[in-house]
Design a protein with these regions (language model features):
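Short Gly/Thr/Asp-enriched flexible loops that form oxyanion-binding sites at enzyme active sites
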Residues: 127-137
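Short, flexible active-site-adjacent loop segments at beta-strand->alpha-helix junctions, enriched
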Residues: 11, 51-52, 99-100, 122-125, ...
């Protein structure tokens, strides 16, 4: 177990909404179990939330991925209901809204943490982006990605992202 668990974008739109996949739905229970284990061990759990505004389609990302998703305040923007009790429990948990693939606040949020575990959605977009940002900000720290608690846009892209993370000295379980 690492100092901090980062749960990336486990939101309704990525699970069962406009960008949902069967693979994303399949990992929800495993992510919940992992987050509970961290919380029960007194470890911090940080959740990212992909956040777009109503004008999403006119943004750079919206022009390249023209599927409205994770629009602030919508049901699709919400973190999965199965994870809500952990989000709301406080106890070292917080939610970080991010308007792009990666969060640039890890140094502020991590404090003196020296190890991280990352899981969530989508392996080939936001999970890998955050893993590489953490790697750049904390070059000597241990970083683990649990592949059984991640899903990509496709199974092939999931595997490709895992291979890239391994090449960047991120442990993939």
């Amino acid at each position: 177990m690492r100092d901090i668990l980062i749960v990336v974008d486990m939101q309704n739109d990525f699970i069962s909404g406009s960008l949902g996949t069967p693979e994303a739905r399949a990992i929800v229970g495993s992510v919940v179990a992992k987050a509970k284990a961290y919380r029960d061990a007194g470890r911090r759990v940080l959740f990212t939330r992909d956040t777009h505004e109503s004008g999403y389609l006119s943004t750079f990302e919206g022009r390249h991925l023209p599927v409205p998703h994770c629009i602030r305040g919508t049901e699709g923007w919400q973190i999965a209901p199965e994870l809500q009790p952990l989000v709301e429990s406080g106890a070292g948990s917080c939610v970080v809204d991010k308007g792009t693939f990666g969060c640039l606040e890890w140094q502020r949020l991590a404090g003196d943490a020296r190890s991280f575990e990352i899981c969530g959605l989508c392996t080939d977009i936001c999970v890998i982006s955050n893993a590489l940002i953490v790697r750049a900000m904390f070059p000597g720290c241990e970083i683990t990605v649990d592949s059984a608690c991640c899903a990509g846009v496709t199974p092939q892209l999931h595997e490709a992202a895992l291979a890239v993370m391994r090449s960047c000295q991120i442990e993939v379980l």
